[in-house]
């Protein structure tokens, strides 16, 4: 019995050593990816450079400094259909650090969502995602948290990590992405970001899986999630009471991919400062419709921190430098009905026009003719008229057939 226990303890020690070696290999970048960590991005066009196509954006003038992407940290809450694909795209883009939050496990029912694989069923989503993402790009730093952010004991830790979990410990993350599938979690993220003044982006897919949206939330500047909440939130309805037994929401990998794509595109434009960042961008798969809009914050928002952020933004706005534009001199309008100064030139001279005109009638003073009747040409051919014979069309046709 003692020997069996000793063998088991020895085996446990061997496994712990193997686990430590595996962790060391992952940190060093010698894991499953087959390459070491790249210290600096290069634009060298070779097959062995994973960043050559990304750095081409700089060479083509789209982005001024693509290397800056490695200095940013992004937190993703919800590693499901949209969140996992979002994390994969940012990993492939070479983001500096990703913080992943989710409490769910991978199920076979998730296999239609593009990212997870069948052998990962039963694993926590954050662990499965980290394992796959680290093998894709070992240059990215990962921090995973397997818990529900809406619970009291975990909400404070969630706030601590987004305010101190940046690329450098103690610095806030640069952006928080909401990829959750319920309003309770969205409200928790909204509350945390309003309190911290943290910019975040929200995303979602409709229950029938044929539409979705993304929304940028800048505390104080744009509407937060509580400024114009959905009916289920405004009515304080428990979401659990709305779900029927045996009925689940639809899920299309195409819609998930589109929403994740436009979300990451907006993230890249926001971080790397190129193009126009959308405050709201919708997607309707039925009509291929992409509506955009900007929503102002609600001065009577239920979230007190949102109202506080609005007041602080109003104080900051006058101090922000405004882009001065040189005054443009307005060109004098030649004629109110002809602002372009277009002139119509006749191909006929005044003398020719006078000679070809007919007699001008005598008119009272102040009245002129718009045009004159042209003279009848003397060499014009007179019209030839034929007298009506009185025969019908049928008779004429019969006579023609006899000829």
UniProtKB/Swiss-Prot annotation:
Subcellular location: Cytoplasm; Nucleus; Endoplasmic reticulum membrane; Golgi apparatus
Keywords: ATP-binding, Cytoplasm, Endoplasmic reticulum, Golgi apparatus, Membrane, Metal-binding, Nucleotide-binding, Nucleus, Phosphoprotein, Ubl conjugation pathway, Zinc
Keyword Manganese assigned: no
Swiss-Prot/TrEMBL GO biological process terms: erythrocyte differentiation; megakaryocyte differentiation; neuromuscular process; protein K69-linked ufmylation; protein ufmylation; regulation of intracellular estrogen receptor signaling pathway; regulation of type II interferon production; response to endoplasmic reticulum stress
GO molecular function: ATP binding; protein homodimerization activity; UFM1 activating enzyme activity; zinc ion binding
Residues the record marks as active site: 248
Motif (UFC1-binding sequence (UFC)): 388-403
Entry keyword annotation includes Oxidoreductase: no
UniProt motif UFM1-interacting sequence (UIS): location: 333-345
Phosphoserine, modified sites: 357, 392
Binding site for ATP: 81, 102, 125, 148, 182
Family under the similarity heading: Belongs to the ubiquitin-activating E1 family. UBA5 subfamily.
Quaternary structure note: Homodimer; homodimerization is required for UFM1 activation. Interacts (via UIS motif) with UFM1; binds UFM1 via a trans-binding mechanism in which UFM1 interacts with distinct sites in both subunits of the UBA5 homodimer. Interacts (via C-terminus) with UFC1. Interacts (via UIS motif) with GABARAPL2 and, with lower affinity, with GABARAP and GABARAPL1.
Protein name: Ubiquitin-like modifier-activating enzyme 5
Organism placement in taxonomy: Eukaryota, Metazoa, Chordata, Craniata, Vertebrata
């Amino acid at each position: 019995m003692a020997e069996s226990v000793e063998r088991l303890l020895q085996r446990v020690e061997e496994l712990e050593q193997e686990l430590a070696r595996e962790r060391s290999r992952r940190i060093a970048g010698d894991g499953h990816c087959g390459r070491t960590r790249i210290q600096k991005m290069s634009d060298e066009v070779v097959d062995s450079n994973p960043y050559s196509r990304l750095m081409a954006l700089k060479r083509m003038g789209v982005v001024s400094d693509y290397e800056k992407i490695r200095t940013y940290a992004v937190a993703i809450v919800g590693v499901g259909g949209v969140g996992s694909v979002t994390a994969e795209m940012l990993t492939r883009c070479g983001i500096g650090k990703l913080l992943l939050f989710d409490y769910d496990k991978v199920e076979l029912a998730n296999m239609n969502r593009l990212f997870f694989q069948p052998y990962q069923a039963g694993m926590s989503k954050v662990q499965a995602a980290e394992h796959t993402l680290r093998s894709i790009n070992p240059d990215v730093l990962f921090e995973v948290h397997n818990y529900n952010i809406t619970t009291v004991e975990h909400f404070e830790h969630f706030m601590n990590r987004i305010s101190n979990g940046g690329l450098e410990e103690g610095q806030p993350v640069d952006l928080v992405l909401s990829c959750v599938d319920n309003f309770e979690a969205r409200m928790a993220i909204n509350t945390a970001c309003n309190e911290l003044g943290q910019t975040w982006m929200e995303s979602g897919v409709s229950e029938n899986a044929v539409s979705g949206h993304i929304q940028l939330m800048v505390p104080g500047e744009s509407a937060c999630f509580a400024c114009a909440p959905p009916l289920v939130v405004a009515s304080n309805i428990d979401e659990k009471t709305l779900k029927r037994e045996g009925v689940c929401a639809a899920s299309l990998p195409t819609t998930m991919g589109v929403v994740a794509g436009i979300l990451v595109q907006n993230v890249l434009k926001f971080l790397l400062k190129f193009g126009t960042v959308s405050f709201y961008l919708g997607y309707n798969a039925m009509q291929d419709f992409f509506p955009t809009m900007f929503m102002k914050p609600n001065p009577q928002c239920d979230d007190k921190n949102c109202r506080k952020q609005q007041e602080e933004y109003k104080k900051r706005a006058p101090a922000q430098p405004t882009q001065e534009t040189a005054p443009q001199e307005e060109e004098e309008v030649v004629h109110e009905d002809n602002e372009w100064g277009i002139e119509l030139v006749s191909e006929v001279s005044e003398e020719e026009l006078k000679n070809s005109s007919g007699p001008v009638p005598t008119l009272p003073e102040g009245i002129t003719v718009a045009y004159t009747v042209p003279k009848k040409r003397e060499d014009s051919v007179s019209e030839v008229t034929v007298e009506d014979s009185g025969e019908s069309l049928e008779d004429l046709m019969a006579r023609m057939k006899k000829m």
